Amino acid sequence: MSVPSRKIRLIMELRQNGVSATPVLAAIERVPRDAFVSAPFSDQAYENTALPIGCGQTISQPLVVGLMTQALDLNDRHKVLEIGTGSGYQTAVLARLCRRVYTIERHGALLREAEARLTALGLHRTVVTREGDGGRGWPEQAPFERILVTAAALDIPKVLVAQLAIGGVMVLPVGKESGAQEVVRVRRTAEDALVTERLFPVRFVPLVDGLPPRDAPGA
């Protein structure tokens, strides 16, 4: 099956499983997922499955990318904070839908690879990257209208809530690494008021504090 046919099949699968927002589907269709997976997995790039990318991380299942992006309810005026750049695939989808993406990755090797991919796609003007501890957010660029976290937190991080604009939305997986996890949508309705919604079950790597040791693989 050709790449265009595989991509069409994937888009149809996402639509059938709850990704109904036309802008989100269009953004996913415009981002070449095969550019974000390593060569041994290139034949699976347009399968609805997560794939390893190194450093113990994965490129998320396209359905999860679609549903979480849809839950953000993005527009082209939004400034978005992404915690966990990973391969850069989710970053690229966000960049097709908003004004600016600020994305943080704790693994330097992954970030450098993601930066190269985003530059090759001409998205480097929309995306600002940082190697760092995502749990701390990016306070000097706050507030953000939208925040997306791509690793599972044990609870809703207060540090990130403080960087969310009033009226803003944060979408993140919540739960233990070895237990049940759910994607939660958080709306900050006032300075000290949040409205939360549980959306769907997922399985993500945990949100880890700090940076990996410099002698660790992929650091």
Curated annotation (Swiss-Prot):
Keyword Hydrolase: no
HAMAP family: PIMT (MF_00090)
Protein name: Protein-L-isoaspartate O-methyltransferase
Active site: S60
Record NCBIfam families: pimt (TIGR00080), PRK00312.1 (NF001453)
Family named by the database record: Belongs to the methyltransferase superfamily. L-isoaspartyl/D-aspartyl protein methyltransferase family.
GO aspect biological process, one term: methylation
Matches recorded under InterPro entries: PCMT, SAM-dependent_MTases_sf
Keywords for the protein's UniProt record, in alphabetical order: Cytoplasm, Methyltransferase, S-adenosyl-L-methionine, Transferase
Record-listed E.C. numbers: 2.1.1.77
Domain of life: Bacteria
Source species of the chain: Rhodospirillum rubrum (strain ATCC 11170 / ATH 1.1.1 / DSM 467 / LMG 4362 / NCIMB 8255 / S1)
Top-tier EC class: transferase
Keyword Transferase: yes
GO MF entries: protein-L-isoaspartate (D-aspartate) O-methyltransferase activity
Primary site of residence: cytoplasm
SUPFAM superfamilies: S-adenosyl-L-methionine-dependent methyltransferases
Record PROSITE patterns: PCMT (PS01279)
GO CC terms, sorted: cytoplasm
Annotated compartments: Cytoplasm
Role description: Catalyzes the methyl esterification of L-isoaspartyl residues in peptides and proteins that result from spontaneous decomposition of normal L-aspartyl and L-asparaginyl residues. It plays a role in the repair and/or degradation of damaged proteins.
Catalysis performed (reactions): [protein]-L-isoaspartate + S-adenosyl-L-methionine = [protein]-L-isoaspartate alpha-methyl ester + S-adenosyl-L-homocysteine
